[in-house]
Amino acid sequence: MPTAVTGPEIERLIQLLARLPGLGPRSARRAALHLIKKREALMAPLASALQVAIDRIRVCETCGNIDTRSPCTICTDARRDPSIIVVVADVADLWALERAGATNGFYHVLGATLSPLDGVGPQDLTIDALVARAHDPRVAEIVLALNATVDGQTTAHYITDLLGEANVKVTRLAHGVPVGGELDYLDEGTLSAAMRQRTLF
Protein backbone atom coordinates (compact mmCIF):
# COMPACT_ATOMS: atom_id res chain seq x y z
CA MET A 1 0.00 0.00 0.00
CA PRO A 2 1.53 3.36 -1.03
CA THR A 3 2.22 5.85 1.75
CA ALA A 4 1.00 9.43 1.61
CA VAL A 5 3.59 11.73 0.03
CA THR A 6 2.03 14.98 1.26
CA GLY A 7 -0.33 16.18 3.93
CA PRO A 8 -4.13 16.14 3.45
CA GLU A 9 -4.25 19.85 2.58
CA ILE A 10 -2.02 19.45 -0.46
CA GLU A 11 -3.82 16.26 -1.49
CA ARG A 12 -7.10 18.22 -1.30
CA LEU A 13 -5.63 20.92 -3.57
CA ILE A 14 -4.56 18.26 -6.08
CA GLN A 15 -8.00 16.60 -5.99
CA LEU A 16 -9.74 19.93 -6.60
CA LEU A 17 -7.42 20.84 -9.47
CA ALA A 18 -8.04 17.42 -11.04
CA ARG A 19 -11.75 18.32 -11.32
CA LEU A 20 -10.97 21.13 -13.77
CA PRO A 21 -11.56 20.36 -17.47
CA GLY A 22 -8.42 19.10 -19.17
CA LEU A 23 -6.57 18.31 -15.93
CA GLY A 24 -6.12 14.71 -14.90
CA PRO A 25 -4.46 13.53 -11.67
CA ARG A 26 -0.92 13.84 -13.05
CA SER A 27 -1.48 17.32 -14.54
CA ALA A 28 -3.21 18.42 -11.33
CA ARG A 29 -0.20 17.26 -9.29
CA ARG A 30 2.14 19.27 -11.56
CA ALA A 31 -0.13 22.32 -11.34
CA ALA A 32 -0.25 22.06 -7.54
CA LEU A 33 3.55 21.85 -7.35
CA HIS A 34 3.86 24.88 -9.63
CA LEU A 35 1.42 26.87 -7.47
CA ILE A 36 3.26 25.92 -4.30
CA LYS A 37 6.65 26.87 -5.74
CA LYS A 38 5.25 30.22 -6.91
CA ARG A 39 3.29 30.83 -3.71
CA GLU A 40 3.77 34.60 -3.51
CA ALA A 41 3.76 35.32 -7.26
CA LEU A 42 0.89 33.01 -8.23
CA MET A 43 -0.83 31.10 -5.43
CA ALA A 44 -1.71 34.08 -3.24
CA PRO A 45 -3.04 36.22 -6.15
CA LEU A 46 -5.00 33.21 -7.45
CA ALA A 47 -6.58 32.61 -4.03
CA SER A 48 -7.48 36.31 -3.85
CA ALA A 49 -8.96 36.29 -7.38
CA LEU A 50 -11.01 33.18 -6.56
CA GLN A 51 -12.39 34.84 -3.42
CA VAL A 52 -13.32 37.97 -5.39
CA ALA A 53 -15.03 35.76 -7.98
CA ILE A 54 -17.00 33.96 -5.26
CA ASP A 55 -18.10 37.29 -3.78
CA ARG A 56 -18.82 39.28 -6.94
CA ILE A 57 -19.66 37.01 -9.89
CA ARG A 58 -23.24 37.37 -11.10
CA VAL A 59 -25.32 35.80 -13.84
CA CYS A 60 -26.77 38.56 -16.03
CA GLU A 61 -30.53 38.78 -15.53
CA THR A 62 -30.97 39.81 -19.18
CA CYS A 63 -28.76 37.53 -21.25
CA GLY A 64 -27.27 34.92 -18.90
CA ASN A 65 -23.64 36.04 -19.32
CA ILE A 66 -21.30 35.81 -16.34
CA ASP A 67 -19.99 39.15 -15.08
CA THR A 68 -19.48 41.09 -11.87
CA ARG A 69 -22.70 43.01 -12.42
CA SER A 70 -26.20 42.41 -13.69
CA PRO A 71 -27.17 43.55 -16.30
CA CYS A 72 -23.71 42.67 -17.62
CA THR A 73 -21.15 44.82 -19.41
CA ILE A 74 -22.41 43.69 -22.82
CA CYS A 75 -26.09 44.33 -22.06
CA THR A 76 -25.34 47.85 -20.80
CA ASP A 77 -23.13 48.81 -23.76
CA ALA A 78 -25.02 51.54 -25.63
CA ARG A 79 -22.78 51.09 -28.70
CA ARG A 80 -24.23 47.66 -29.45
CA ASP A 81 -26.90 46.99 -32.07
CA PRO A 82 -30.24 46.36 -30.30
CA SER A 83 -31.76 44.84 -33.45
CA ILE A 84 -29.67 41.64 -33.17
CA ILE A 85 -29.78 38.92 -30.50
CA VAL A 86 -27.27 36.09 -30.88
CA VAL A 87 -28.44 32.89 -29.19
CA VAL A 88 -25.74 30.61 -27.75
CA ALA A 89 -25.89 27.44 -25.69
CA ASP A 90 -23.25 28.38 -23.15
CA VAL A 91 -21.27 31.34 -21.82
CA ALA A 92 -18.11 29.84 -23.35
CA ASP A 93 -19.72 30.23 -26.80
CA LEU A 94 -20.55 33.89 -26.05
CA TRP A 95 -16.96 34.54 -25.00
CA ALA A 96 -15.64 32.83 -28.15
CA LEU A 97 -17.80 35.05 -30.38
CA GLU A 98 -16.68 38.14 -28.46
CA ARG A 99 -13.00 37.20 -28.83
CA ALA A 100 -13.56 36.81 -32.57
CA GLY A 101 -15.30 40.20 -32.78
CA ALA A 102 -17.98 38.37 -34.73
CA THR A 103 -20.97 40.54 -33.81
CA ASN A 104 -21.96 43.88 -32.36
CA GLY A 105 -25.35 42.60 -31.27
CA PHE A 106 -26.57 41.39 -27.92
CA TYR A 107 -26.63 37.79 -26.67
CA HIS A 108 -28.93 35.25 -25.08
CA VAL A 109 -27.43 32.24 -23.26
CA LEU A 110 -29.73 29.20 -23.22
CA GLY A 111 -27.70 27.33 -20.61
CA ALA A 112 -27.53 24.13 -22.72
CA THR A 113 -29.15 22.56 -25.77
CA LEU A 114 -32.16 20.27 -25.87
CA SER A 115 -31.04 16.72 -25.22
CA PRO A 116 -33.74 14.14 -24.51
CA LEU A 117 -31.10 11.46 -23.88
CA ASP A 118 -29.56 13.59 -21.12
CA GLY A 119 -32.94 14.65 -19.75
CA VAL A 120 -32.59 18.29 -20.87
CA GLY A 121 -35.95 19.66 -22.00
CA PRO A 122 -37.28 23.13 -22.90
CA GLN A 123 -38.06 23.84 -19.24
CA ASP A 124 -34.34 23.55 -18.45
CA LEU A 125 -33.36 26.30 -20.91
CA THR A 126 -34.05 30.05 -20.93
CA ILE A 127 -36.23 29.78 -24.04
CA ASP A 128 -39.24 31.61 -22.54
CA ALA A 129 -37.04 34.62 -21.76
CA LEU A 130 -35.70 34.53 -25.33
CA VAL A 131 -39.22 34.53 -26.79
CA ALA A 132 -40.10 37.52 -24.59
CA ARG A 133 -36.98 39.38 -25.76
CA ALA A 134 -37.81 38.58 -29.40
CA HIS A 135 -41.08 40.50 -29.05
CA ASP A 136 -39.20 43.72 -28.23
CA PRO A 137 -39.94 46.02 -31.21
CA ARG A 138 -36.25 46.97 -31.49
CA VAL A 139 -35.27 43.35 -32.23
CA ALA A 140 -35.20 42.51 -35.96
CA GLU A 141 -33.01 39.38 -36.08
CA ILE A 142 -32.35 36.34 -33.91
CA VAL A 143 -29.08 34.60 -34.84
CA LEU A 144 -28.95 30.96 -33.74
CA ALA A 145 -25.25 30.42 -33.00
CA LEU A 146 -25.63 26.82 -31.87
CA ASN A 147 -23.33 23.86 -32.45
CA ALA A 148 -23.83 21.83 -35.63
CA THR A 149 -24.74 18.75 -33.59
CA VAL A 150 -28.02 16.85 -33.43
CA ASP A 151 -28.86 18.53 -30.12
CA GLY A 152 -27.88 21.96 -31.45
CA GLN A 153 -29.98 21.60 -34.59
CA THR A 154 -32.94 20.20 -32.61
CA THR A 155 -32.76 23.24 -30.34
CA ALA A 156 -32.55 25.58 -33.34
CA HIS A 157 -35.66 24.05 -34.94
CA TYR A 158 -37.57 24.20 -31.65
CA ILE A 159 -36.73 27.88 -31.15
CA THR A 160 -37.55 28.71 -34.78
CA ASP A 161 -41.02 27.20 -34.35
CA LEU A 162 -41.61 29.18 -31.15
CA LEU A 163 -40.54 32.44 -32.78
CA GLY A 164 -43.01 32.04 -35.64
CA GLU A 165 -45.33 34.70 -34.20
CA ALA A 166 -42.59 37.20 -33.41
CA ASN A 167 -41.84 39.78 -36.09
CA VAL A 168 -38.16 38.80 -36.39
CA LYS A 169 -35.89 37.20 -38.96
CA VAL A 170 -34.34 33.97 -37.64
CA THR A 171 -30.90 33.11 -39.05
CA ARG A 172 -28.20 30.62 -38.15
CA LEU A 173 -24.45 30.50 -38.50
CA ALA A 174 -23.16 29.16 -41.80
CA HIS A 175 -21.56 25.74 -41.58
CA GLY A 176 -18.78 24.68 -43.85
CA VAL A 177 -15.10 24.94 -44.64
CA PRO A 178 -13.12 26.61 -41.84
CA VAL A 179 -10.63 29.35 -42.67
CA GLY A 180 -7.37 27.58 -43.52
CA GLY A 181 -9.13 24.22 -43.82
CA GLU A 182 -8.14 21.66 -46.44
CA LEU A 183 -10.97 19.83 -48.19
CA ASP A 184 -9.60 16.32 -47.90
CA TYR A 185 -9.45 16.66 -44.09
CA LEU A 186 -13.12 17.62 -43.75
CA ASP A 187 -15.93 15.17 -43.08
CA GLU A 188 -18.71 14.61 -45.63
CA GLY A 189 -21.33 16.50 -43.60
CA THR A 190 -19.18 19.62 -43.44
CA LEU A 191 -18.43 19.47 -47.17
CA SER A 192 -22.12 18.99 -48.01
CA ALA A 193 -23.10 21.96 -45.83
CA ALA A 194 -20.39 24.11 -47.41
CA MET A 195 -21.62 23.23 -50.91
CA ARG A 196 -25.26 23.96 -50.07
CA GLN A 197 -24.40 27.30 -48.45
CA ARG A 198 -21.99 28.50 -51.13
CA THR A 199 -21.91 32.24 -51.87
CA LEU A 200 -20.93 34.50 -54.77
CA PHE A 201 -17.20 35.13 -55.15
From Swiss-Prot:
Domain Toprim residues, every copy: 83-178
Q: Which CDD domains match?
A: TOPRIM_recR (cd01025)
Q: Which InterPro entries match?
A: DNA_Rcmb_RecR, Rcmb_RecR, Rcmb_RecR_Znf, TOPRIM_dom, TOPRIM_RecR
Matching Gene3D superfamilies: 3.40.1360.10, 6.10.250.240, RecR Domain 1
State the UniProt keywords alphabetically. Answer: DNA damage, DNA recombination, DNA repair, Metal-binding, Zinc, Zinc-finger
Question: Could you cite one Gene Ontology molecular function of this protein?
Answer: DNA binding
- Zn-finger (C4-type) intervals are 60-75
Q: Does the keyword Cell inner membrane apply?
A: no
Q: GO biological process: what's one of them? A: DNA recombination
Does the UniProt entry include the keyword Transmembrane helix? no
Q: Name one Pfam family in it.
A: RecR_C
Q: Which family does it belong to?
A: Belongs to the RecR family.
Summarize the protein's role. Answer: May play a role in DNA repair. It seems to be involved in an RecBC-independent recombinational process of DNA repair. It may act with RecF and RecO.
Task: Identify the PANTHER family for this entry.
Answer: RECOMBINATION PROTEIN RECR
* Listed name of the protein: Recombination protein RecR
